Amino acid sequence: MKSILLLFIIYFSSIITLSSKSPFEAYLQTKKYLYVWSYPNSDNFVKFVTQHNFTRVYLYCGCIEWDYDKLSKGNLYDSGDKDAKLLIQELISKNIEVEIAIYLNDSPNDFSNVEKMEDVAKAMGELQKTLKFKALHFDVEPSSASVYPKLLQMYENARKYVPVSAILKPGWLYKQLEDVKGKFDEDYYAKFQQCETLVDAIMLVSDYSELMAYDYRYSTIERFLNDYDVIRKRHPSHEGKPVLELDPNIVEEGISAEFKKDNTKFFEFLENVSKKFDGVTIHNYKSWNLDLYCFKPSSNSEYYFGEPKQCE
């Protein structure tokens, strides 16, 4: 009888413990990833990533327009106070996956030097043998349908050398490939004739994708994620994740405004999305630090960790 009573006590104690978990504590346990465009203080950045329990980092390491000579030789642009390769090694040693993030040109529709991307992919493939990063992440988001074939060809060529991770714009979920058929050479379009949407085509020539569900209302983001999930399930070997962003400059509407009023709903939303997609990405390190603690990390900033502050 005593043993049964003890089991009941343990069981109900665990329920009470779980129910008393704060939204921030639940956030810490949520499976999540982080975009990083720069890391002014690498020591603080690593503390932030590890203590917030991020398990993957998308680390910006250059673009073709400005860093081709460096990237094509297997070197990386350092977006902080520490050599990018050393930082990647440090993160991986802490069981944090890394995707090397690059982009093509400052102008999103400029594909004039796209052939150089294959040289970079080849060099990154060689670098991956020693650096052991997960994939080459392409932050390439053209708005012109005329370059969609070049976008797909870029991924296809790069994938010969290194796993490819692609950004997806929400509008591409609804871009019927048949509607842009005229932008393709007939023979190349034939490769994608079974694809319903542009997202289907991108998933066909990449290994991973990230849907950029920016700062919209919760209902809009949920619609995007549901439609993304439908397409994702048509490609079972493809890993697709959503990316959520809270813009600290937005104060009127969207999830950023909601977060400023009460962060509970966002943390719950983040947890639910992560469960559905087996992980969710936050964009990006500087903005998220500002959202949580009311300051952007800088080279001389002290590290702060704990419950979010109420920013004025």
Task: State each model region's role.
Residues 214-219, 240-312:
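Substrate-binding cleft of secreted/luminal carbohydrate-active enzymes
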